[in-house]
């Protein structure tokens, strides 16, 4: 399983309250293949940097997913076929190394170094 972040820009004519339930149909592609949806973050209506399909605004939604690459590709394909979706962008999320492990290694190195004489 890989970690992904998916940003979707939807048509602003949609009601913002119906955005998350309408995305659930698409997210079943991920769930049916054994993946999981960690977070659905609806940013709401925002102004676009440039017009897309003669729209100056869009409803932004950011999703955090754990899934196989084939499932994410199928989800992206289905979203692009939907007329209410203006744009999609799938990014592979980089998992940060644990800070605790880095701190422990640094402490171990400092402990093994001889004290400097003044």
UniProtKB/Swiss-Prot annotation:
A Pfam entry, by short name: Ribosomal_S6
Keyword set includes RNA-binding: yes
Thylakoid is among the record's keywords: no
Listed InterPro entries: Ribosomal_bS6, Ribosomal_bS6_sf, Ribosomal_S6_plastid/chlpt, Transl_elong_EF1B/ribsomal_bS6
Key words, A-Z: Ribonucleoprotein, Ribosomal protein, RNA-binding, rRNA-binding
UniProt GO BP: translation
GO CC entries: cytoplasm; ribonucleoprotein complex; ribosome
Gene3D superfamilies: 3.30.70.60
Molecular-function annotations in GO: small ribosomal subunit rRNA binding; structural constituent of ribosome
HAMAP family: Ribosomal_bS6
Family: Belongs to the bacterial ribosomal protein bS6 family.
NCBIfam families, alphabetized: S6 (TIGR00166)
Its job: Binds together with bS18 to 16S ribosomal RNA.
Stored PANTHER family: MITOCHONDRIAL 28S RIBOSOMAL PROTEIN S6, SMALL RIBOSOMAL SUBUNIT PROTEIN BS6M
Protein name as it appears in the record: Small ribosomal subunit protein bS6
Native species: Saccharopolyspora erythraea (strain ATCC 11635 / DSM 40517 / JCM 4748 / NBRC 13426 / NCIMB 8594 / NRRL 2338)
Highest classification ranks of the organism: Bacteria, Bacillati, Actinomycetota, Actinomycetes, Pseudonocardiales
């Amino acid at each position: 399983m890989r970690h992904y972040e998916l940003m979707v820009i939807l048509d602003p004519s949609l009601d913002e309250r119906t955005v998350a339930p309408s995305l659930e149909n698409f997210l079943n592609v991920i769930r049916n293949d054994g993946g999981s949806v960690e977070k659905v973050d609806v940013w709401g209506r925002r102004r676009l940097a440039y017009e897309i399909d003669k729209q100056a605004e869009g409803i932004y939604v950011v999703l955090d997913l754990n899934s196989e690459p084939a499932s994410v590709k199928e989800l992206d394909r289905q979203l692009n076929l939907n007329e209410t979706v203006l744009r999609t962008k799938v990014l592979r999320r980089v998992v940060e190394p644990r800070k605790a492990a880095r701190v422990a290694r640094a402490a171990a190195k400092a402990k093994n170094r001889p004290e400097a004489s003044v």
